[in-house]
Amino acid sequence: MAKIIFIEHNGTRHEVEAKPGLTVMEAARDNGVPGIDADCGGACACSTCHAYVDPAWVDKLPKALPTETDMIDFAYEPNPATSRLTCQIKVTSLLDGLVVHLPEKQI
């Protein structure tokens, strides 16, 4: 299991245990973390699972594929340096302690 820390826009923290093989989006959804809408269910066809990866973790994640970066353009206030779609980040033991910040809203 990997601990993933979600920080809402208002500062509320949610620490969840995520099973390797799931996505960060699935971990949020399965644990009732607010702010991850995931309207497309993880198909990389919307931007409602958008989050900002903590800067300390950006280089520890696999690079986003072009399909993800294209979809991030539709997210609320994307940040080219830290924005990711959580449906595209697979949980592994190497992500234990991952911190993601949630945007004010999803669009």
Curated annotation (Swiss-Prot):
<dbReference type="GO" id="GO:0051537">
    <property type="term" value="F:2 iron, 2 sulfur cluster binding"/>
</dbReference>
<dbReference type="GO" id="GO:0140647">
    <property type="term" value="P:P450-containing electron transport chain"/>
</dbReference>
<feature type="domain" description="2Fe-2S ferredoxin-type">
    <location>
        <begin position="2"/>
        <end position="106"/>
    </location>
</feature>
<comment type="function">
    <text>Ferredoxins are small electron carrier proteins that participate in various redox reactions. FdVI is an essential protein required for growth of R.capsulatus. May be involved in Fe-S cluster assembly.</text>
</comment>
<keyword id="KW-0411">Iron-sulfur</keyword>
<feature type="binding site">
    <location>
        <position position="49"/>
    </location>
    <ligand>
        <name>[2Fe-2S] cluster</name>
    </ligand>
</feature>
<dbReference type="InterPro" id="IPR018298">
    <property type="entry name" value="Adrenodoxin_Fe-S_BS"/>
</dbReference>
<dbReference type="Pfam" id="PF00111">
    <property type="entry name" value="Fer2"/>
</dbReference>
<comment type="similarity">
    <text>Belongs to the adrenodoxin/putidaredoxin family.</text>
</comment>
<keyword id="KW-0479">Metal-binding</keyword>
<dbReference type="InterPro" id="IPR036010">
    <property type="entry name" value="2Fe-2S_ferredoxin-like_sf"/>
</dbReference>
<keyword id="KW-0001">2Fe-2S</keyword>
<feature type="binding site">
    <location>
        <position position="46"/>
    </location>
    <ligand>
        <name>[2Fe-2S] cluster</name>
    </ligand>
</feature>
<keyword id="KW-0249">Electron transport</keyword>
<protein>
    <recommendedName>
        <fullName>Ferredoxin-6</fullName>
    </recommendedName>
</protein>
<keyword id="KW-0408">Iron</keyword>
<dbReference type="GO" id="GO:0046872">
    <property type="term" value="F:metal ion binding"/>
</dbReference>
<dbReference type="InterPro" id="IPR001041">
    <property type="entry name" value="2Fe-2S_ferredoxin-type"/>
</dbReference>
<keyword id="KW-0813">Transport</keyword>
<feature type="binding site">
    <location>
        <position position="40"/>
    </location>
    <ligand>
        <name>[2Fe-2S] cluster</name>
    </ligand>
</feature>
<feature type="binding site">
    <location>
        <position position="87"/>
    </location>
    <ligand>
        <name>[2Fe-2S] cluster</name>
    </ligand>
</feature>
<dbReference type="InterPro" id="IPR012675">
    <property type="entry name" value="Beta-grasp_dom_sf"/>
</dbReference>
<dbReference type="InterPro" id="IPR001055">
    <property type="entry name" value="Adrenodoxin-like"/>
</dbReference>
<dbReference type="GO" id="GO:0009055">
    <property type="term" value="F:electron transfer activity"/>
</dbReference>
